[in-house]
Amino acid sequence: MKTALLLGIHCHQPIDNFNYVFDDAIEKSYKPFFEILAKFPEFKISVHFSGSLLEYIRKNDKKLFCLMQELSDQIEFFTGGFYEPVLASIPSIDRVAQITKLNRYIKKHFNQTPKGLWLTERVWDNSIIMDLKSCGIEYVIVDDYHLKASGAKLDNLNGYFTTEESGEQMGVFPINQELRYAIPFYSLEKTQDILHKFSQEDGKNAAIIFDDGEKFGIWPKTYETVYEKKWLEKFIIQTLADETIEVQTFEEFYTKNKPIALTYLPTVSYFEMGEWSLNSSDGFELENIIQAHPELSKFLRGSTWKNFFTKYQESNWIQKRYIELSKKQYDSKFYKEALYKAQCNDVLWHGVFGGIYLPNLRDNAYRYIIECEKQLDQGHDIIDIDMNGYNEYKFKNGQLLSIVSSKQGGQIFELDLLKHNFNLQNTLTRYEEVYHHKIELEDSETVKDTKTLEEDDDIATIHDNTLSVDKEISLDYDWYLKKSAIDHIVSNEITLEEFAKNNFREYGDFANQAFEVLKCSKKKLHLQRDGGIYDVQNLQTTLCKNYHFKKNKIEVDIDIDNASSKYNYLHEWNLHFASLQEVSFNGVTLDTQEQYSMIEIISDSLIIKDKYLDKTFVFTSKNLSKIFITSLNSISQSEKGVDITNQGVSIGFLYNLSSNFTTQIDFDLKKREDSIV
């Protein structure tokens, strides 16, 4: 009775993540893993590293890179997109280019021609098969859940399957979920018992595990278990000594064995990803159904990975921006490299890790989007970027690139400082998440009982994290996108706190509804909405919003007809700053330690000084009643627990309305010493 153990690790860090994150991962995970592997040349393993991570290691830890080269005889290197895109989310031409780039890198540095591909986040879509075949790929890694979702028998997921698209075949290896949750979290005895379940007389059964290398040292409490308590070394010794287990690479097993059956996979990722991509109400309902009826889990699934583009509009915007730029196929190596880097997947979704909630990841994506834009001509363009059936209007003048959405309240969706490769509109709307309900139900004394786990030499995975907070938080959500030049009709008695928490009453229908485009020229955009003010008596009201995009300046003219002095007009901007503690508002700074830090100013101007960017942003207007300023913070989960993350600053310019109201808001970009750029 024998089992073929196919063990693989996937290692990746987001493009341009902080150096200390890379270095910590190298010291706590990658380096000790390969140092232990070097002690056992007969222990074979399959490995996937994203290209950007390999490059970082090559440049910053030559010793580790050389060790990986020395071990190449016992390692099978898997390929993928060089900068770790979700392959189904990028155009075919970029898919082939990114895989080819990593193939060549592996051949050059490790003298292997990859036959296997690590499927980023195991996001399967049949549309990728033709491109994979053109790159020489013979098999990919998915989850057993992919096969379960296609109707495969649960007791038959112990080898590889084959699938096809237009007659092009592809091998499919399903990762065993039980092993994925066991290694390296269960005791050695429990793990070995699971492996023995796969034993078969002819030795053709495979125990398949291919998962994050960061589980070995980076995930909470794993460094102590895996290396200090020598779980990994003991596991290798125990496995090699077990005559019923034969350690193989995926290529060896693929070459020696026939597929189990033909299968056709649905468009799906691993089960948890389907849960995460649901909107909060559906996600909460699915969670309750699974808890009540675990026997139905085979027939239940969440949404597809691409649903993140509808769940988080900021994710959709980034993805559609690089789709737009890819279509141009500008013939420049620098342009294409920037484009491929922008396609890194981490920023586009959210599960256990920060993802879309991490401003630095969004900054990195926009850095490369803007690098591409800088190589294109100045001027204006009209295009449906986000593919919602409504055009966006792009203006590139001087050092500013501005994009306005006609559908979403005529808001400014993107505001790029071209010289700095920085998007001031890289804000994030406050979304409701399923796990927010868990935070609400817990108190500061709630601590997960891990004694039983410790007694069994098991450790909890990040999926078992307790979401507790050490101080009271306020869960507040936004019903409109937090971008800029947003039009509100509000009460005369609106307060700063109501604005901050977005629980003020909205009387108008202008903030998130479509505007008609009356005129668009090289530097001007005229918008109009025939809407209303909705109260005891409804008023048909027209709001005209005219943009003038000058060199390093934006003028916004507002005309509101048939309004009422019973209400105030609130004009809202939301701006993103890379280092909020280095930003002042008319000389006052926000407290970055508080969930809500608020400032109320009575002035006709607002001077924002950003020491980090070495820029000053000046808003001026007439007849202002007051200015509201508040931090825009999100509540999200990560591998460490609950994060309160600054996503920007909300600024509200408040005016007393009249029957025929007119005002102008000017936004000036200046150097920090206040001279015009």
Question: Which residues make up each language-model segment?
Answer:
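Catalytic alpha-helical scaffold of carbohydrate-active enzymes acting on polysaccharides/glycoconjugates
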Residues: M1-K115, R122-Y181, L188-G203, E228-T244, ...
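Acidic-aromatic substrate-binding/catalytic surfaces of carbohydrate-active enzymes
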Residues: D23-E27, I93, A97-T100, L401-K519, ...
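Acidic (Asp/Glu-rich), glycine- and aromatic
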Residues: Q408-G409, E414-H420, T429-E433, K438-D443, ...
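A contiguous, surface-exposed recognition patch within enzymatic or periplasmic domains that forms
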Residues: I439-N503, T589-T662
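Loop-rich catalytic cores of soluble enzymes, especially ATP-dependent carboxylate-amine ligases
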Residues: E138-K204, F210-G217, E228-K229, V268, ...
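Beta-strand-rich recognition/accessory modules
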Residues: G379, D384-I385, G389, N502-C544, ...
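Active-site and substrate-binding clefts of carbohydrate-active enzymes
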Residues: K2-K31, A38-F40, L157-T162, S166-M170, ...
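Short helix/loop capping segments that flank catalytic or ligand/cofactor-binding pockets
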Residues: A149-S150, Y181-P184, G217-W219, I403-S406, ...
